């Protein structure tokens, strides 16, 4: 009754493709740039981008750093080659190190991790500008809702094709589109620092996270009822709800005070 509805993968694919085609046409753009991390979200986004505008109009960028698992870098380039798209690999460490040498801040793991995401997005937008392409985002609904992305980093894009799909939906659509099994099977990770995985940071599996988010956000069920239904603590539910509220600013245009309150 309160489970996430089963995804109609065929219709979802077609709806996303039509959405992407419309947005590229409206912007009078010539194609799409996609950052290829080697993970399931960017891989699925690249598959959909190729279906929407053709592989000849998709440009992929693989941007490893010293904390990027070798497997992820190899998967990023492998996906570009599998899809037959033009791509470029740019290691970001020289840019990162120059920035850190100027700012002289080298011991803030979170700030440095976010900086990596912002460096990558600057590179992506540079190529998008030069090619008259749109930046194709790779975020999913689960991560967007809890703010599990870097503001003005991996959260910056022109369109977000899979942004309304929960992470569990992403897996279903990826299987339907025949994304390579090794990418589907490996643990999601951002690679912003060593030995990092998404689920460790979030504090629960995506499966449980999605169940909480669907019930609290889509169905508007109260915390106590969700906790009882999922056999977890109310604190676990409230923590996710709090994260959703606390991170709403990440998806909004910066707010300003209303001029009507300032006039005489």
Predicted regions span which residues?
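Conserved G/P- and acidic residue-centered "switch" motifs that form tight phosphate/ATP-binding loops
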Residues: 39
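Conserved beta-strand segments that form the floor/walls of ligand-binding pockets within enzyme
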Residues: 35
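ATP/NTP-dependent adenylation/nucleotidyl-transfer catalytic domains that generate, transfer
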Residues: 1-32, 44, 48-51, 56-59, ...
